[in-house]
Amino acid sequence: MTTTTGLRGRWAQGLQPRYFTWVIMDRLGAGERPGGFARNHRKVRRQEELIWLSVHGFTHIVSLLDSPHNLHAYEEAGLASVHVPLGPHDELVPRLEVVYATIGKLLDDPMEKLFVHHEEFGDRLLGVMGGYLLYAGLVDQGTHAISIIEKLTGRSVGSVGREIVAATLDEHLHR
């Protein structure tokens, strides 16, 4: 478990992950990979963001990264994690079903509070979050899912994210 012993004030609270957004209030949050992505990744920032997730009661981190990066850090911080690689674009549809089912199964427990991340807070993650709203039956139209995600994040969902939402509908992925 990450210890905040000796830390005072805002440092004991950690640092909110970059672009953190509630998709389902107090149950499902999303953001950039803790510590940042690729060359911008910083170990100290990752530790601060993991402290924030722990202090705020997150029970699982769902990593959509293709690689197992950060999983050891989550374990060291005492945060349970699930690695569900989103994979390359041409393998997306079969993987979406696994991603959605994993998130859904975790959220079936009312005590679960999830943080989902991809490498960066971009179209792929936004599309998956919009697709999950469809999968879970929280919305029934792709345009509604996209609109909600855009409103929550303050970002436009681009072509890749829209393709993910469309694939969720086209493949009839739902609970």
Predicted features and spans:
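Glycine-rich nucleophile elbow surrounding the catalytic serine of serine-hydrolase chemistry
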Residues: 122-128
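Cys-dependent protein tyrosine phosphatase-like superfamily
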Residues: 1-115, 128-175
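Conserved S/T- and glycine-rich ATP-binding loop of Class I adenylate-forming
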Residues: 118
